[in-house]
Amino acid sequence: GLITRFHERQSPESIYFRFFSPRPRLSERELEHFTRVDHRDRVAFVALLDDELVGVARYERYEGTDTAEVAFFVDDRHHGRGLATVMLEYLAAAARENGITRFRATTLPNNRKMLKVFASAGYEVASQLDDGIIDLAFDLRPTDDVTAAVDRRERLAEAASVRRMLEPATVALIDAGAGGPRSTTDPGRRPVPIEDGCLVRLAERLRDGAFPGSVTLGGPAALDELPEGVDLVVVAGPAAALPEVLDRCADRAAGAVVVLSEADASQTEAILEVVRRRGLRLLGPGSLGVCNTDPAVALDALCVEARPLPGTIGVLSESGEVVSSVLDHARRVGLGISTLVSTAEPADLNVADLLSYWADDDRTRAVLLHLGSAPLPSRFVRAARAASRTRTVAALASTARVAGGRPSPEQRRDRAMLRQSGVIPVASLQELFAIGRLLADQPPPGGRGVAVVGASRAAVDLAVDACAAAGLDPVTGHVGPAPDSLAAAASDPTVRSVVVIDTTPGPLPPTDLVDAVLGFSSDHPELTVVISAVGSERPARLVDDATGVAVPLFTFPEHAGNALGRLATAREWRSTARVYGDETPSGLDVDATRALVERWRADGGPDQVLELDASRQEQLLAACGLRVADRREVRTVEQAVAAAEEIGWPVALKARRRDRRKRTALSGVALDVAGADDLSATWARMEEALGPEGMQPVVVQRMVEQGLDVAVRIRRPDRIGTVEVGLGGPMAAFDPWELGVLPLALPDASMLVAASSVARALTDPLTRVPVVSLVHRLAALVDAVEEIHEVRADPVIVAGPVAWITDVRILIGSPRGELPVRHLG
C-alpha cells in the first residue's frame, strides 16, 4: 500500500537514519504496527501529495506516563520544505489534547535534519549521548518561543504562497471550456478557439506590458504541456468544469490559481475540496485578477480596462465591482500602485496571506484594504500587527447591519480585530484614498504637531479648526507670503506636518506658491507637507519633475487634517507596539498556569468541559497575579458562621445557583450579613427558595468597600478569542459590553476599557488603571493557555486603587477550534 511504496522510494541513508539499520523492506509485523493507532496513546499524521504518501509523523505514549516517543519520516524529494516541522505542530497539539506533556526521540548524531526540526520548532530540547545514540526530550507546553516560531513559519509560508502569485516567472491562461494549447511566446503554434475574451485580453496585456516570463493561453489540455511548477494559472469558464481544471493545475504543481468565473455556494465548495485535497492556493472564485507594477515583474493580469500606475501602494479589494473604480480614480489622482489583488469573497487566499507578503515587500510603503462582508480570518490580527509595525495599513470595512441597526457579533469582532492590529479604519473610499495619496508622496507625520500657513486669515483659521477636530495639535497658524510663513513653520521644533492653504482662484495654484511648497518639501524631508485649495478643483498633486518631489493637494482642509490625524494615531500605535509588543504581564507564571490546567483536565474526559471550584479558581488567578476577595466554601450554617468569624463581619452569602444581576437572598446573593443570627435567617430563606441542590456549596465572602461593579468576560468559542468589558452586577443586563479580541496587549486593554461604559463611570484615566491591569492579565492568561474556554469575572468591585474580584467562573477543556490548514509555500 501507501506505506510500502513510500518506504521503498527512500534512500538507504534516510532509512538508516529512521531505523538505525538497513531495512529495504518493511515486514508484515512492522506494517501492522505502523498502521495501528487509537487516536489517544498512539497517534499518526500523514502528508499526502495527490495519491502518494510524502511524510509520516507519529507518537506512541509510554504506558502509564504523560510522555510519548515521537518519530518522523519525510520523503527524500520533499526534504527542506519544513514538512516535518509542520507535522510536529500537529502532533504536539494532538498530544496536549490527550494529556501528553513531553516528547522523547532518539536519533543518530549525524542526523542533522531531525535535530534541526526540534530546534526550529522553538522547543527547549535536552539531549544526552549514550552509546552512539542521542536521546532527546522536550516539554510540549507552548512557550513563547514555540508560539513565536509557529507564527514566524506561518507568515513565511503565507508570504511565499503569495509571492509565486504576484512575482511569477510562468503564467498560464486557461479557458475551462476550450481545448488545446497556444503559447503567446511562440506565435507559430496553431491557435485554438478561446471562448473567454478576458483571457485573450490578458494575454495581449502581458505581452504589451513586457512581462518577461512565459505565457501560455489555451484550454485545459494546455496545462499538460507545461513544465512542472507553473507559478500562476488564471482560469475562466463554466464553474462546473473548474474542479477538473484545478486537478490538472495540481498535476503541474501550480503555485497559485486565480479563478475569474463566478460560482455559487455548492460550486465553490466543490472547488475548495480540490484545493484542500491537492494543496493548491486559490484566489477567487469571482476574482478580477492581480497585478504587480515592478518593472522586473510587469504582471498585469487584471480583467478591467484601466491600467495601474507604478508606485508604492499595495491594494486589496474583496469586491470585484470596486476594482475598476479604484484603478480609474487612482490614475486620475496620480496614485501609484505596487501590487493590486482582487479576492472577491475569499475562499482560500485572503487578507492575512496578503498582509504577510506586504509586510516584507520593500516596494510597498502602505496598504489599502477594501474589505467585504466576509468575516476576517483568525490569523488577521497577528498578520496585520506584523505589517502595521513597519508600514501603514488602512481599511474600509463593510458597514452592513443586522435588523435593528445593531452590528452583528461577527462585525463587532472584526472591528476589534482592526482596532487592535494597528490598522487605520476609514468610513469611505475618499478617506482611504486620502491616506494612500498622502503616503505615496510624503512621509507619515512624526507627531501631532501641525502648522497651518496661508495668505488668508479666515482660511487659515478654518484649517486650524479642521486639524484640531482631527486630533492634531495646531502649533500655530502663519498668515503671509508662502516663503516667509513656511520658514516660520519649520523653525518650530514641535511641528511635524505643514498644511498649506491656497485661496487663489483659477485651475492651478500660482507658480510662486508651487515653487515655494515643492522647494520647502525638498529642503525638509522630515516634515509631512500637504496643500489644500479650500474647495477649488485643482490637480491632485504638485510634482517637481527635476527632483521627483511631490506634494498631495486636497480639495478641503478637513480631508487633509483627517488623513494627517489618522496617520499620527497609527504612528503612536507603532510606538507603543514596539515598547509593549505582546509581552506577558509581570507576575503571570505561564508555565505554572499551563501545568495546573493540564493536571486538572485529567479529572475529566478528553471532550469534557470542567468548571473550576473556588480553590482551583484561586490557584489559577494567583498564578497570574490576581486575587479573589477573601472567601470560604461551606456546606452548613455552622461552617458559614465559623467562616464569617474568621473572615470578619459583615459578609456576603452566595449560593451555588445565583443570579449575579440581583442581590437578594431569594436570588442566591445576600450582602452585608451582619451576624450569626442574620446569617442563619438568610440561609433559611435562601435554602427555601433554591432548594438544597441550588445551595451547595455556599460561599461566605468578606464584604469589600463600595465601588463600581465591572464585568470582564473572556471566551474562546473558536480560534478567535474575545474579551468583553462593561458594567457588572445588576447593571450588566442594561450595558452593551465593549468587545476586544485575543491577543490583547496592554495598550489594547487600555483602549478597550476607555471605549466601554466603565470609562463613563470612571472619568479619570488613573482610576481605570486597576481595571486595565486586570483585563490585561486575564486576557494574557486565556491567550497563553488554550485549554481555558472561558473566564467571567462579575462583579469586579473597583474601589480606589484596587479592583476586587468577588465572583468568577472559569471553564477548561480541550482546545477549541480545528487546527488550521498549513501551507508550505
List each language-model region with its residue ranges:
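Long, contiguous binding/interaction regions
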Residues: 1-163, 168, 525
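Catalytic-core regions of core metabolic enzymes
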Residues: 145-825
